UniProtKB/Swiss-Prot annotation:
Subcellular location: Cytoplasm
Main subcellular location of this protein, as a coarse class: cytoplasm
Reaction catalysis annotation: (R)-4'-phosphopantetheine + ATP + H(+) = 3'-dephospho-CoA + diphosphate
Source species taxonomy: Bacteria, Pseudomonadati, Pseudomonadota, Gammaproteobacteria, Pseudomonadales
Protein's recorded name: Phosphopantetheine adenylyltransferase
Amino acid sequence: MNRVLYPGTFDPITKGHGDLVERAARLFDHVIIAVAASPKKNPLFPLEQRVELAREVTKHLPNVEVVGFSSLLAHFVKEQGANVFLRGLRAVSDFEYEFQLANMNRQLAPDVESLFLTPSEKYSFISSTLVREIAALGGDISKFVHPAVADALNARFQKN
């Protein structure tokens, strides 16, 4: 069974992330969305909420599982029994970092391959950072995120 692990902070999960998950779900028997705790990134949403939002966005995909983690990714991928890391590339600017990460992961988990997918053209410009900035300034984020994510962002910024 081919199991792919798609790690990220997903703060929040966007339509670009969802697009990659949908395509991975067609390519692999089992897709694991691994939501990283990432405390050094100071995420807007707590880990549990990011996991729940990712589950909501992907609930229509029976071969997709969402889990949170706070350990070293190379250890976590082995715990999950995955044999592939999935990473998204939006632009050439993403490549250098992702290339370094893939090579580091190869050193730490040599049996796990890195696979890069590009999002559909209509999602290639979306980033979680930009979505958070737009939401914080009261902009319409409905084109960029699932309705449940938009609701969570809007609720979060109405409190501030």
